[in-house]
Structures are given as C-alpha cells and as structure tokens.
C-alpha cells in the first residue's frame, strides 16, 4: 500500500477545505477518514487555521509526517462539498488512490476568475441596499461604491497587501466614494449606501466558524478565528470612519 500517497491525499484535501473556509473540526474529520484507509496503527490529523499536520505510523514502516502551511483563506462552499464527496467515494472504495489525488488537484486549481469575483463584489451591495430599506438612488450609488471596492480588492491582492490594511483601505474607498457622491446629489440615505457597500468585507462566515470550533473544544482555532474577525471588523470601522471624516461627511464643519 502506498502510504505516502494516502498521506498526500489527506493533506491536499485538508488544504483545499481549509482554504475554502471549512471549520477545523470538519477538515480534521475528513482527513482522518482518508488516513484510516491506510489501516495503520497511528493515523492522526491536526489542523489549525494556518497549518495542517498529518501522521501515519505502523510496525512495518517508518513514520510518515506531512505538514502544510495555509496562508490564503477565503469562502468557497462548492469546493468543500466537492472534497467531501470525493473523500466519501474514496473511502467507500469507488476510487483509487491515483484517481482521488488527480481529482483533488483539479479541484484545487478551480478558482473564481477575477471577473466573476469582481462582479459578485458589485452585486452584493446592490442586493443589500434594498434589503436595508434603500431605493433606486441608494442602489445605484451602492453599485458605484461596489465598483470602487472591487478595484481596490483586486489591486490589493495583486500587490499582496496584508488583510488588515486592505480591509481598511477598501472601507476608506467605499466611504469616500459614497460621501463624495452625497456632496453633489441628494435625496438618498448615505448610511444605507455605506453599510450595503461594506457587506462584502464583513467576516460573517469567520465568526460562525469561530463559534463552531470553540463549541467543539478547538479553542486555538476558534480563538484565532475570533481574533481575525475582530481585526477585520476593526479595520472596516477604522477605514470607513477616516473616509467619512476625510470628506467632511461625518462632521458638518469639515475635516477634523
């Protein structure tokens, strides 16, 4: 039996799931099921927000351990579902080790294109504006702010800007755009536009996963996710506040 390849499959599956926003307990569970197909005495998986460790050990082999760092994380539920389905098929014996590895490699390479990501970034504010009580004007201004947000996110990722600074700059850009438009037009609610336009940045999934990990006893990952969500929220608030002050929208007297 190719123990090394089974280990590689488990680590690759875990990496894809963790990058796609899966909870750490779910990643560990999937990896453990894959590792158990090796039928070794020791088959362990340890997952944190930024890394994965997996080990296989038996009397007739040298211990095998693999570690993978995970730097970039996002949200892609479809990829999580795909990995779960492939892992189940492999564990049921419907796929070989080689077939499973190739399928996982294909999933890892499937990412949203920049155009699709930017389109979604624009449509989210457009969808939330009516939900928050906005009318046609709020929706149109939210679309404009969404375009600015999409541009800043694309630029920030291209130059590999840190997430805290990128979130702050994006919130700043959204607030400045909305506040500047409010100076030349009237008859719409500035708060609705800013809140709607910032929704793509809100760490809702991160907070949910943090609570799930914490309730399952994974305090390290849960605490790390809570801290990440808090820093994201702080960056959004800082950027939006500075942006409004910058254009004199927060204080009628002008910039302070």
Regions flagged by a language model, labelled:
Residues 183-256:
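Generic detector of multi-pass transmembrane helix bundles and their immediately adjacent loops
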Residues 1-95:
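Soluble N-terminal domains of membrane-associated systems
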Residues 72-138, 228-237, 248:
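Alpha-helical transmembrane segments and their cytosolic membrane-interface
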Residues 68-72, 132-138, 189-193, 254-256:
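Interfacial loop-to-helix junctions that mark the boundaries of transmembrane helices
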Residues 111-188:
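Core alpha-helical transmembrane segments of integral membrane proteins
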Residues 2, 19, 23, 75-78, ...:
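Catalytic cores of large soluble enzymes that bind and process phosphate-bearing ligands
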């Amino acid at each position: 039996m190719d123990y090394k390849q089974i280990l590689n499959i488990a680590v690759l599956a875990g990496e894809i799931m963790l990058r796609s926003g899966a909870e750490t307990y779910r990643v560990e569970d999937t990896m453990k099921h894959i590792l158990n197909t090796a039928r070794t005495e020791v088959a362990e998986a340890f997952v944190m927000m930024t890394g994965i460790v997996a080990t296989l050990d038996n009397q007739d082999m040298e211990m095998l351990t693999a570690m993978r760092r995970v730097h970039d994380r996002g949200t892609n539920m479809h990829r999580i579902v795909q990995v779960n389905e492939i892992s189940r098929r492999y564990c049921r014996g419907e796929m070989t080790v080689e077939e499973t590895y190739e399928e996982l490699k294909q999933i890892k390479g499937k990412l949203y294109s920049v155009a699709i990501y930017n389109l979604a970034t624009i449509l989210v504010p457009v969808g939330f504006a009516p939900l928050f009580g906005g009318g046609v004007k709020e929706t149109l201004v939210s679309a404009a702010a969404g375009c600015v947000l999409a541009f800043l996110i694309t630029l920030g990722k291209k130059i590999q800007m840190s997430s805290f600074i990128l979130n702050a700059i994006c919130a700043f850009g959204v607030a400045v755009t909305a506040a500047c438009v409010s100076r030349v037009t009237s008859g719409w609610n500035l708060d609705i536009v800013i809140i709607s336009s910032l929704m793509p940045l809100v760490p809702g999934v991160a907070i949910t996963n943090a609570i799930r990990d914490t309730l399952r006893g994974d305090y390290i990952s849960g605490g790390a996710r809570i801290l990440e969500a808090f820093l994201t929220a702080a960056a959004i608030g800082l950027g939006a506040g500075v942006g409004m002050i910058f254009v004199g929208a927060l204080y009628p007297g002008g910039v302070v």
